């Protein structure tokens, strides 16, 4: 199974952008969850506005789908400035970045998604821009080449990444604010689903919102995507109000169980239990057993399973926990 095809993939998919624009919170007061991040950013933004300064450069990291782009847009809205958006892989040449930087107005936000994928050449351009609001440009080639400095307006760089550890130390150290986004609680996701349903003019019971939330793997992007699919199901079934029963039927049709697992999650956990006696099993063996790339297991499947206590990552390999056996209705093997 390809990760991009999974309904519960936390990566962005076609069709997500339209609904995101309709339901994305614009201000911190609309932002549900991440209470510590919300409180801290409120203080930092208010302080910057009182001083009439640009906000410090901000690094946002965490698993996909938790709202890094949303938070970047909220920061720009709260500061009352424009936001220019790009991503690490798109910035191939120093000139690409220079063009964006020189078009910024004072205090504007430059948002770079997947900032861990910037090339070393682009990072070298960023260092003086972030630190001194200056841009070093080479004019000419060979012995006649010379460097000139351009002054930039004070701006805020917001970088987003799922792999903070992949950032180079010089780049990471230049961010004055670092925020980690955590998986959301079922309660917060229930509020997010209810809010999204309201933005889409859907009538939905509290039970339906909760049912979608608890199968969303702690991820708002997945919750909103499941809401769209439940809406489709309700439309075809001529359900005026999306009830808890309608939500359960729709999610069962999508093969998403009560823990938010789909076929691929269950395949991985079943392989650990049935083929490797609960583990420990090495990553390469596990990847071969389920026919998936090791990166897919390590970056996509494991984080949520480990966070929820269904899988343990040890020096000897992956181990299924007691919770996994209970989920499948099995007795844990004992030696």
Swiss-Prot record:
Determine if Glycosyltransferase is one of this entry's keywords.
Answer: no
Give the record's keywords alphabetically.
ATP-binding, Cytoplasm, DNA damage, DNA recombination, DNA repair, DNA-binding, Hydrolase, Nucleotide-binding
Principal location listed in the UniProt entry: cytoplasm
SMART domains xrefs: AAA (SM00382)
Question: Under which EC number(s) is this enzyme classified?
Answer: 3.6.4.-
Region annotated Large ATPase domain (RuvB-L), chain positions: 4-184
GO MF terms listed in the record are: ATP binding; ATP hydrolysis activity; four-way junction DNA binding; four-way junction helicase activity
Can you supply a Gene Ontology BP term from the record?
A: DNA recombination
Extract the InterPro entries matched here: AAA+_ATPase (IPR003593), AAA_lid_4 (IPR041445), DNA_helicase_Holl-junc_RuvB (IPR004605), P-loop_NTPase (IPR027417), RuvB-like_N (IPR008824), RuvB_C (IPR008823), WH-like_DNA-bd_sf (IPR036388), WH_DNA-bd_sf (IPR036390)
Residues involved in ATP binding: 23-24, 65, 68-70, 131-133, 174, 184, 221
Which top-rank group of organisms is this from? Bacteria
The residues the record assigns to binding Mg(2+) are 69
Question: Looking at the keywords, is DNA-binding present?
Answer: yes
Q: Which transformation does this protein catalyse, written as a reaction?
A: ATP + H2O = ADP + phosphate + H(+)
Which family is it part of?
Belongs to the RuvB family.
Domain note: Has 3 domains, the large (RuvB-L) and small ATPase (RuvB-S) domains and the C-terminal head (RuvB-H) domain. The head domain binds DNA, while the ATPase domains jointly bind ATP, ADP or are empty depending on the state of the subunit in the translocation cycle. During a single DNA translocation step the structure of each domain remains the same, but their relative positions change.
Show the NCBIfam families listed in the entry: PRK00080.1, ruvB
- What role is this protein assigned? The RuvA-RuvB-RuvC complex processes Holliday junction (HJ) DNA during genetic recombination and DNA repair, while the RuvA-RuvB complex plays an important role in the rescue of blocked DNA replication forks via replication fork reversal (RFR). RuvA specifically binds to HJ cruciform DNA, conferring on it an open structure. The RuvB hexamer acts as an ATP-dependent pump, pulling dsDNA into and through the RuvAB complex. RuvB forms 2 homohexamers on either side of HJ DNA bound by 1 or 2 RuvA tetramers; 4 subunits per hexamer contact DNA at a time.
**Assembly and oligomerization:** Homohexamer. Forms an RuvA(8)-RuvB(12)-Holliday junction (HJ) complex. HJ DNA is sandwiched between 2 RuvA tetramers; dsDNA enters through RuvA and exits via RuvB. An RuvB hexamer assembles on each DNA strand where it exits the tetramer. Each RuvB hexamer is contacted by two RuvA subunits (via domain III) on 2 adjacent RuvB subunits; this complex drives branch migration. In the full resolvosome a probable DNA-RuvA(4)-RuvB(12)-RuvC(2) complex forms which resolves the HJ.
Record's protein name:
Holliday junction branch migration complex subunit RuvB
What species was this sequence derived from?
Answer: Mannheimia succiniciproducens (strain KCTC 0769BP / MBEL55E)
């Amino acid at each position: 199974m390809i990760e991009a095809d999974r309904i519960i993939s936390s990566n962005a998919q076609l069709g997500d952008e339209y609904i995101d624009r309709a339901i994305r919170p614009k201000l911190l007061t609309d932002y549900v969850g991440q209470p510590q991040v919300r409180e801290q950013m409120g203080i930092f933004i208010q302080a910057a506005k009182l001083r009439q300064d640009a906000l410090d450069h901000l690094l946002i990291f965490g698993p996909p789908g938790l709202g890094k782009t949303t938070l970047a847009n909220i920061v720009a809205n709260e500061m009352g400035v424009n936001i220019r958006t790009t991503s690490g892989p798109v910035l191939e040449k120093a000139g690409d970045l220079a063009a964006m930087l020189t078009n910024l107005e004072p205090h504007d936000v430059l948002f770079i998604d997947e900032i861990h994928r910037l090339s070393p050449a682009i990072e070298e351009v960023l260092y003086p821009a972030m630190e001194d609001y200056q841009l070093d440009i080479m004019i000419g080639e060979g012995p006649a080449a010379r460097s000139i400095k351009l002054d930039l307006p004070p701006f805020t760089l917001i970088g987003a990444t799922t792999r903070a550890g992949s950032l180079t130390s010089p780049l990471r150290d230049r961010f004055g604010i670092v925020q980690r986004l955590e998986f959301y609680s079922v309660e917060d996701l229930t509020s997010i689903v209810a809010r999204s349903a309201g933005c889409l003019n859907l009538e939905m019971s509290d039970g339906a919102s909760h049912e979608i939330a608890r199968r969303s793997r702690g991820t708002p992007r997945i919750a909103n995507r499941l809401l769209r699919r439940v809406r489709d199901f309700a439309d075809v079934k001529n359900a005026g109000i999306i009830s808890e029963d309608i939500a359960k039927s729709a999610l069962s049709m999508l093969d998403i169980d009560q823990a938010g697992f789909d076929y691929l999650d269950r395949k991985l956990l079943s392989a650990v239990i049935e083929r490797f006696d609960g583990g420990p099993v090495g990553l390469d063996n596990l990847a071969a057993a389920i026919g998936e790339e090791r990166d897919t297991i390590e970056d996509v499947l494991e984080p949520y399973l480990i966070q929820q206590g269904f899988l343990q990552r040890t020096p000897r390999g992956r181990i299924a926990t007691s919770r996994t056996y209970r989920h499948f209705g099995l007795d844990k093997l004992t030696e």
